[in-house]
Amino acid sequence: MTVLGATGKTGRHVVAQAVERGWVVRAAGRRAAGAGEFVAFDWDDESTWHPAFAGADAAYVVIPFNHAGAPEKAPDVIRAAAAAGVARIALLSTIDVDHAPDDDPTKVAEQTLLSLPVEAALIRPTWFLDNFTVGSFRGMLDTGELRLPAGEAPFPFVDTRDIAAVAVAALAPDGPTGPLPVTGPESVTHHAVAEALEAALGRPFRYIPVPAAEFIALLESRGFTHSYGDFLADALGKVANGSFVIPVADTVERHCGRRAYTPAEFARHFAQS
């Protein structure tokens, strides 16, 4: 199988879990991953696309939205995978893609995949717990204060290891296809996430609800753009006011034979690693 984004948040776990199954894994990208066989893949160089997929039975596709031009090229990459003979393709999507406009790149990528003569799995995760440790909010972990405009509403955050587990299940012969929502085992508040990390790391960490303007200014002070801060503040605000509610899904339990990881289990794993 071929894995795009093999060094990323989900891709590295897909590679590791597929290797654990004894599969031959091509870790495709511009640099070698921690496991798997490296194969060159560059979103800006179409000559690398076919060789990365040729001979693979399955592929995991991640769209790097921070790579200029990649979202627009995603349909062509997916078509290239199918043209190379890949029979099963799992696309990393998002939990709320059905509510996105028709020209949304993720929605277009999903529709492209579904139009092809392949077994298609749409991996639709909710927000990553990993965003608190290696993502946009990592700086807040270092200061001991998670300052977000998210109010007190609960949310079913997911561990990226669970996203990978569902993807690997979908890439197996006779694996599940179609939309696969991936959430944590329960909805929890940001207070609960902070408490889990505090307990695992053995140092103070608390959640403090703040106004959107303060949050945006905080992100700007750490090098993020105003537009990115405004985008996150809008999403968090919808959680706070109850207009963005995600039900807990049992996808991990149904297809992986175990329940999804809790925030406490995620935090302990992060602390140990």
Spans of model-derived segments:
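A hydrophobic C-terminal alpha-helical subdomain
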Residues: 213-273
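Short phosphate-engaging motifs
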Residues: 34, 189, 262
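Active-site regions of enzymes building and remodeling cell-envelope glycoconjugates
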Residues: 35-44
